[in-house]
Amino acid sequence: MTDAAADDIAARRWPHATAPRRILAIRFQALGDTMITLPYLLGVRRRYPDAELHFLTREEVATVPKAMTQFDRVVALGGDRNRFRTWLSALRHTPALLARRYDVVLDLQNSRISNFVRRAIRPEAWSAFDRFSPRSAGERTRRTIAAAIGFDAGMDTALELRGGGPDIDALLLRYGWKAGFDLVVLNPAGFSPARAWPTASYIEFARLWIERHPRSQIVLLLMPSKRAKATEISIALGEHCIDLTGRADQLEAFAIVGRARFVLSEDSGLMHMAWTQGTPTLALFSDSRRDWSAPQGSWSDCLDSSDLPCGPCGLPVCKFGDNRCLTRYPAAQVLERAEKLARAHLA
């Protein structure tokens, strides 16, 4: 069968009525991009329960995939973000990947490295990620998978960790969780100043939420670089806040947002950890493109800047100096959207 475009995605479709024996999915971008693939690949696992499903990713984002029950094998490339070292790692792994004789390769990265690996291991069927169309990353992932296997595997958010995952109860209790209280995750983690909703707005949102839902506690799962912001929120909220900044690893953070009643987040990997598990998630976007990066599913929503002449700008610092695309949303309005999502999820 010759290479062909399948539904406008570069692909060679699986030609057999029987199921493939061994499938390799490739994704080694940032943490959030990797998280997005998980519910769609679980859809593949549900469709082909007897096939081996392997995942090729990078070491720095491999912790969660390695703990997932849906993968039979996870291969992690080294090299951090150094292109040369990543190439060397890919070259070292390619002979072993070739020896496994994959029937299908789902190249959900579509980079020079992933294209090299895909071509080198010579699968009978394959597809390459649509990198540029104005669709969400989740939708492009779904369509890329369908182009290779010939059907829509859908999205399944019932992601499972081996052995039930880490003991997050012990971690939460150690830092002030009141057993039985709902967890509400606030994540002011945008990597640039332009992505930041005001810290005072997060504090006001938290106070309003707790006033209406007193059996709730706020959880912070920020990186150490955001410690000053976390400290300000934690001091303001007192016993109502569980500050796990720098204290929870990737797997623990994944498990906590999976249990949370609600997540409010700027554009970040944690935001994608949340919606991909079916947790009600409200994203706050400023410079980010909603059509590419917004959370998916009826349990998610996104407040973004696409209705403004200046947005989404892609700039690290607001050219007006006031982050007006985010500051226009008062805490009470955000709370209203948040409660709507949380109520719909419970219903």
Give the location of each predicted region.
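Catalytic machinery of carbohydrate-active enzymes
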Residues: M1-A347
